[in-house]
């Protein structure tokens, strides 16, 4: 049966010997035996030359990056390129599927969630333990543990090792895309968060906004105080040799509006020989835009690069201006819809639990980051389940003057804390929303607006759009001391 009661789940590990033989006196009834073990994911890194190919390391334990770094980049940083000759390290696309276990998983889960994992393992394999709601809460704790290990033990440790050699670190998106995890938090360790965009633009697959959305990476950079947002730029499966600079400029403009400030061309290939027929050799046979010195439009590259350089220079000056801070919720595990309908004339950034709890405060009625980026409102969009600590932080922000838009959650998002967590949850929900189901609930210096759409709430608060325009104009607003400027394109 798919449903099973927690008190019916027995741990019979002690009945199995070292050779894997089970010697168990089976009680009355019908039993299903789950034999649980773990193996290497079986993935190798790629694409890579034969000499640089090997097994993927453990991403949920520091032993993985320790061995990987010492055996690869560390050999250069502490060898032929020591003394500052190597100044950076880039971790490219994930491309190694996912990992769900490490030897210390049970200890790590208890440390993170506060209760033992083993009896709940059937839920990982698709069983409903007790009921749907209880199982959903456990699975959130499970995914949060994996996400935290993924961020701290791999990316955090890899950056720590790189910094010991004076290397700046940039890496691309993976959390929330391949691995279910908080897609902002793991960027907090990056010196330069990185995303990617493809050409040509399209409504589906690789050229669409939602294939590899820019907004999560740009938001992570802003939330964690990183001024530069790099992008693997102009990647393509269509090696048709008919791309041109005007088309590439449009692709760049669209993604710059979403927050990209630094371009890493995909690809520029080394073409030292002069006896090849033009335009020369590309990267493989079918990926990337061929930036080559024998391209027909290469003579115009100086002007094109000057345009890109000027734009990206300005896009890193000052601070971004957005009205709405969109809280992605305590159940965040996948990438959001970048095409989600949003009020015209307003801009937003995403916010995650870690930033909400540890990096946000209120100043002059605005929600602010330590770097001074300001937001007029914080939006809770469809947050069905929440954590008590999240609600308590929201309450503290509202009392200091923050404006929160959104309805009360329907339930608790975790099994951690049990009755204590439920009491904290109930108290915070009552303090924030009280008996108000629609309208404004004033608390201290701030308020909670509920029972209406974001459009209606912004109107209720008498907030005017930053930009009023017709047609297909795209824009971005930045501000520095004494000046505002807008990047506008169509």
How would you name each of these model-derived features?
Residues 75, 79-88, 93-490:
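Carbohydrate-binding surfaces of carbohydrate-active enzymes
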């Amino acid at each position: 049966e798919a449903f099973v009661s927690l008190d019916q789940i027995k741990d019979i590990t002690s009945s199995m010997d070292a050779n894997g033989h089970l010697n168990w006196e089976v009680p009355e009834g019908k039993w299903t035996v789950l034999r649980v073990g773990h193996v290497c994911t079986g993935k190798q890194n790629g694409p890579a030359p034969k000499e640089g190919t090997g097994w993927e390391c453990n991403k949920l334990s520091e032993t993985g990056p320790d061995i990987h770094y010492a055996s690869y980049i560390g050999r250069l940083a502490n060898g032929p390129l020591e003394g500052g000759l190597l100044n950076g390290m880039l971790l490219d696309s994930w491309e190694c599927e996912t990992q769900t276990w490490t030897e210390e998983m049970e200890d790590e889960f208890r440390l993170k969630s506060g209760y033992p994992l083993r009896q709940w393992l059937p839920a990982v394999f698709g069983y409903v333990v007790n009921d749907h709601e209880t199982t959903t809460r456990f699975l959130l704790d499970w995914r949060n543990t994996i996400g935290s290990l993924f961020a701290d033990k791999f990316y955090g440790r890899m950056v720590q090792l790189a910094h010991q050699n004076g290397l700046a670190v940039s890496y691309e998106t993976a959390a929330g895309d391949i691995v279910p995890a908080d897609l902002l938090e793991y960027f907090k360790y990056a010196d330069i968060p990185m995303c990617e965009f493809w050409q040509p633009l399209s409504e589906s697959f690789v050229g669409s906004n939602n294939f590899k959305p820019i907004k999560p990476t740009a938001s992570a950079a802003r939330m964690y105080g990183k001024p530069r947002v790099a992008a693997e730029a102009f990647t393509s499966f269509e090696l048709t040799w008919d791309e041109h600079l005007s088309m590439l400029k449009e692709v760049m403009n669209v993604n710059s509006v979403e927050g990209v400030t630094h371009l890493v061309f995909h690809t520029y290939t080394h073409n030292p020989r002069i006896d090849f027929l033009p335009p020369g050799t590309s990267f493989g046979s079918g990926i990337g835009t061929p930036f080559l010195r024998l391209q027909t439009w290469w003579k115009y590259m100086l002007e094109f690069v000057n345009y890109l350089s000027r734009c990206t220079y300005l896009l890193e000056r000052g601070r971004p201006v957005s009205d709405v801070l969109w809280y992605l919720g305590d159940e965040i595990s996948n990438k959001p819809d970048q095409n989600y309908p949003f009020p015209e004339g307003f801009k937003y950034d995403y916010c995650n639990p870690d930033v909400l709890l540890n990096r946000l405060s209120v100043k002059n009625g605005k929600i602010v980051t330590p770097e001074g980026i300001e937001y007029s409102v914080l939006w809770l969009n469809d947050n069905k389940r929440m954590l008590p600590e999240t609600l308590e932080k929201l309450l503290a922000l509202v009392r200091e003057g923050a404006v929160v838009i959104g309805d009360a959650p329907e339930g608790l998002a975790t099994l951690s804390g049990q009755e204590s967590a439920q009491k904290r949850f109930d108290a915070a929900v009552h303090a924030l929303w009280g008996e108000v189901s629609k309208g404004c609930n004033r608390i201290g210096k701030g308020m909670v607006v509920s029972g209406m759409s974001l459009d209606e709430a912004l109107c209720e608060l008498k907030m005017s759009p930053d930009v009023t325009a017709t047609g297909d104009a795209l824009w971005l607003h930045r501000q520095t001391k004494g000046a505002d400027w807008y990047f506008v394109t169509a």
